[in-house]
UniProtKB/Swiss-Prot annotation:
This is Alpha N-terminal protein methyltransferase 1. The keyword Transferase applies. CDD domains: AdoMet_MTases (cd02440). It comes from Arabidopsis thaliana. InterPro entries: MeTrfase_NTM1 (IPR008576), SAM-dependent_MTases_sf (IPR029063). Pfam families: Methyltransf_PK. Alpha-N-methyltransferase that methylates the N-terminus of target proteins containing the N-terminal motif [Ala/Pro/Ser]-Pro-Lys when the initiator Met is cleaved. Specifically catalyzes mono-, di- or tri-methylation of exposed alpha-amino group of Ala or Ser residue in the [Ala/Ser]-Pro-Lys motif and mono- or di-methylation of Pro in the Pro-Pro-Lys motif. It comes from the Eukaryota. Its EC number is 2.1.1.244. One of its GO terms (molecular function) is N-terminal protein N-methyltransferase activity. GO terms for biological process: methylation. Keywords: Methyltransferase, S-adenosyl-L-methionine, Transferase. The keyword S-adenosyl-L-methionine applies.
Length: 276
């Protein structure tokens, strides 16, 4: 993959392969394990609050949820209601769920069940507490998995939607591809992925502090192709502070969509600022 990038300390890399060799070695499972351990350790030192998980930008929560809801409503209508019917029992997986922010403010209102996946125990404990009185008998958080994304293997065919937001940057490229290849089997027929992530203006930006990588749009699309996923629809998130990375939403399907919907992305300067 011929993609150049930089890290948060200003070091330049001529290729993504060069960066990964430095960070996780080649076939060095010990070094790769440490990469993941360091990433979790960073978040273990963060307060289990909206402001904490959003990197001090708690005020972006409303804009984020509004943008996600507009995107999700269209997808549910096109992909599920029109094809299966309005009365089916819908189940979602919230990947990198943190304290349950997205589940509480969005997913639990549209899905009958939501499972939460989060490797940081204190965040998941906070999610249980935050969601204890949220929803209803027919719209509720069901399972709380304290498992890293790269190790998660749920029941086959359980989910209508797998929501991946501000967490996939912690996975290496190989584990990114492995996760989505496994996750295809987690989806029900007609189900889809939503990936919502920060975008680097060019190439990639490696954050040395939290051990994550912010990928560019072409970088993401290369990885999606490697996963055998089809780009169904995209949308740029609006209303975020200028100093943050641009944020883009991708809807991805296993089946080939009849038409690909694209929107023109606005680019902003790279900033080593990761929000979760």
């Amino acid at each position: 993959m011929d993609i150049c990038g930089v890290d948060s300390e200003g070091k330049e890399f001529n290729s993504v392969q060069e960066m990964w060799r430095e960070e996780i070695g080649e076939g060095d499972e010990t070094k790769k394990t440490q990469w993941y351990r360091d990433g979790v350790s960073y978040w273990e030192g963060v307060e289990a609050s909206v402001d904490g998980v959003l990197g001090g930008y708690g005020h972006v929560n409303d804009a984020d949820i509004i943008g996600s809801e507009v995107f999700l409503k269209t997808l549910l209508q096109e992909r599920l209601v029109n094809n299966v019917g309005a009365n089916q029992h819908l189940v979602a997986l919230d990947c990198g769920s943190g304290i349950g922010r997205i589940t509480k403010n969005l997913l639990i209102r549209y899905f009958n069940e939501v499972d939460l996946l989060e490797p940081v125990a204190q965040f998941l404990d906070a999610a249980r507490e935050n969601l204890a009185s949220a929803g209803s008998e027919t719209h509720k958080a069901t399972n709380f998995f304290c498992v890293p994304l790269q190790e998660f293997t749920p029941a086959a065919g359980r989910y209508d939607v797998i929501w991946v937001q501000w967490c996939i940057g912690h996975l290496t490229d190989n584990d990114f591809v492995s996760f989505f290849n496994r996750a295809k089997g987690y989806l029900k027929p007609g189900g889809f992925f939503v990936v919502k992530e920060n975008l680097a203006k060019n190439g990639f930006v490696l954050d040395k502090e939290d051990h994550s990588i912010t990928r560019s749009d072409p970088y993401f699309k290369q990885l999606f192709r490697q996963c055998g996923l089809h780009l169904y629809r995209t949308k740029d998130q609006k209303g975020l502070p200028q100093e943050l990375f641009a944020v883009k939403m991708y809807a991805l399907t296993v089946d080939t969509p009849p038409k690909i919907h694209r929107t023109r992305s606005k680019t902003r300067s790279n900033r080593p600022q990761i929000i979760k």
